[in-house]
């Protein structure tokens, strides 16, 4: 696919269109295109009622919007059944749901939970909790300094004691894609289930839950241009069916007596309370937008921008990129350190040129410890970034050490 | 507020070549101060004799603002009484919150170079880390016989 760097997609995004912001914090959250903002507005203008309740026209319209979104997501991730798609408020809630409903009920003393060293805290803390309550043991699958998880590491780490493997498809610090299909195969041979955190990958990799054969998958809408506060949990139907509800209350029941309740069928068993229907509608619009642009095109363009930036950074002295040496393994994420300049100072100086980057430990402290740094600066790209964005970033980046009083 | 003006020579000098960033084996007080959200981590050491700060130093790491601010503070409190040091701490924190007079900024000497932090809410914690740790040492040891 040939990508023309001069074609700009900024015009689709009001925040970018109407400003000179150089937005390079896409791994934290993406900007929202007009079509998503308009879809949310239209829901409140024309379809607002409590979905899944009420027998009047408006309530049925709201329900239809919510269910249309579910169908759109099902197709987007290639799930087998619509009821395998559960709306949550984001990746964090999705993983907490799995940990609380599956982990707390199907794990016991001596069972092992395997997570990778590059997990975001949202895929660490729920498992630390499950381990502490059930007596299960939390183990770590380690990568090399380039972020690669080898076949040998996978074979050695997954044993018959392993019950859950929870792993990110794409590290939010390294940008490296993990060999999920390989991990799933080995895990299943040992009778373990696989939970895939797709928060970071969903915008870069075409997710096919059936091809990957993952048992659970979670992502947040806001990283793929939908509103904040809407996310997805995918789970295989046979697993979801045997799990108890996570949250209890309205909308997740068939009937309730003074002492007991019969829970609703999937997916509603896991959607207690009023769904974020406007968020779901926004998510549907975002997926439609992605489909209209083309996932492959978006990714190719992101890789091209990543490479341009990667090559330019490599020419600046005293800057060290974290992870793979090949920019194609970075998937839009370049984390780096600058000798003797703290990432918060880097971020503040870049901010003067309207460049937005993330500084800190990126909610992945175990990875930072493992790779031997306390914090770093991260620039992350999406297809709507431009060559000008990179030029502005690199120009500002090049002057930082001098501004901080160093001679070079 | 332009950052290029903000990272002035006083700040960068104290960050790159701190005078008081070293251990102090005969310290009478030592306290760790941390900003968990951003990773600034210092341990402040004081040698206090008869309520007078005879020496002050710090170790640790963090952003330029946290390091320079701690170094400037150490410079300022050496030779002062506990009460004077606490008065400066209170004044410095007020400066960072944006409610201080020009006379007070003058009295804060080099620490006055950090006054523009009052326009940078994200960096307030970095600037006050050393001073907060100083306050905490004296609050925790109010009854200590020094």
Where are these regions (language model features)?
Chain B
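Alpha-helical support elements that line or immediately flank enzyme active sites
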Residues: 69-79
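Secondary-structure capping and boundary motifs in well-ordered enzyme cores
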Residues: 38, 65, 119-123
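C-terminal binding/interaction regions
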Residues: 1-25, 82-146
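Short, thiol/selenol-centered motifs that function as redox-active sites or metal-ligating centers
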Residues: 61-67
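Structured beta-strand/loop patches that form or line metal/cofactor-binding pockets in enzymes
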Residues: 17-56, 60
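Alpha-helical macromolecular-interaction surfaces
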Residues: 67-68, 87
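A generic structural motif
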Residues: 60, 78-79, 130
């Amino acid at each position: 696919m040939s990508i023309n760097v001069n074609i700009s997609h900024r015009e689709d995004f009001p925040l970018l269109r109407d400003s000179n912001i150089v937005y390079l914090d896409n791994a934290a959250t993406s900007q929202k295109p007009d079509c998503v903002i308009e879809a949310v507005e239209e829901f409140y203008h024309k379809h607002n009622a409590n979905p899944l309740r009420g027998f009047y026209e408006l309530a049925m319209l709201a329900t239809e919007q919510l269910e249309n979104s579910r169908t759109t997501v099902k197709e987007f991730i290639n799930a087998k059944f619509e009821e395998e798609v559960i709306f949550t408020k984001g990746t964090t809630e999705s993983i907490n749901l799995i940990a609380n409903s599956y982990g707390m009920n199907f794990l016991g003393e001596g069972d092992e939970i395997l997570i990778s060293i590059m997990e975001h805290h949202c895929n660490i803390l729920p498992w630390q909790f499950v381990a502490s309550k059930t007596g299960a043991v939390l183990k770590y699958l380690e990568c090399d300094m380039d972020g690669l998880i080898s076949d040998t590491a996978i074979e050695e780490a997954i044993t018959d004691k392993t019950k859950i493997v929870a792993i990110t498809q794409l590290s939010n610090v390294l940008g490296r894609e993990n060999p999920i299909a390989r991990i799933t195969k080995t895990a299943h041979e040992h009778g373990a289930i696989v939970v895939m955190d797709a928060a970071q990958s969903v915008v870069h990799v075409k997710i096919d839950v059936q091809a990957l054969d993952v048992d659970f998958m979670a992502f947040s809408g806001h990283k793929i241009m939908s509103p904040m506060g809407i996310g997805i949990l995918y789970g295989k139907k046979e697993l979801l069916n045997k799990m108890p509800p996570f949250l209890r209350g309205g909308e997740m029941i068939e009937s309730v007596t003074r002492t007991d309740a019969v829970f609703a069928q999937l997916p509603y068993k896991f959607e207690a309370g009023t769904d974020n229907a406007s968020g779901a509608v926004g998510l549907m619009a975002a997926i439609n937008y992605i489909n209209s642009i083309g996932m492959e095109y978006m990714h190719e363009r992101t890789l091209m921008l990543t490479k341009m930036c990667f090559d330019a950074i490599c020419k600046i002295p005293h800057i060290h990129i974290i992870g793979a040496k090949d920019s194609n393994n970075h998937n839009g994420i370049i984390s780096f350190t600058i000798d003797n300049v703290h990432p918060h100072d880097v971020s503040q100086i870049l901010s003067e040129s309207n460049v937005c980057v993330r500084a800190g430990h990126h909610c992945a402290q175990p990875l930072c410890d493992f790779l031997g740094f306390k914090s770093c600066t991260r620039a992350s790209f999406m297809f709507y970034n431009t060559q000008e964005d990179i030029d502005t970033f690199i120009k500002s980046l090049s002057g930082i050490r001098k501004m901080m009083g160093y001679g070079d | 507020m332009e950052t290029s003006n903000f990272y002035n020579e006083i700040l960068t000098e104290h960050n790159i070549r701190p005078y008081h960033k070293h251990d102090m084996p005969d310290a009478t007080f030592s306290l760790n101060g941390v900003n968990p959200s951003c990773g600034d981590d210092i341990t402040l050491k004081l040698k206090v004799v008869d309520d007078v700060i005879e020496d002050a130093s710090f170790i640790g790491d963090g952003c330029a603002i946290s390091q320079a601010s701690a170094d400037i503070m150490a410079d300022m409190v050496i030779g002062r009484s506990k009460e004077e040091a606490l008065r400066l701490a209170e004044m410095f924190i007020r400066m960072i919150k944006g409610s201080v007079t020009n006379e007070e900024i003058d009295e804060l000497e080099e620490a006055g170079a950090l006054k523009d932090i009052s326009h940078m809410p994200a960096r307030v914690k970095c600037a006050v880390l050393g001073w907060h740790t100083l306050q905490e040492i004296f609050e925790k040891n109010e009854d200590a016989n020094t």
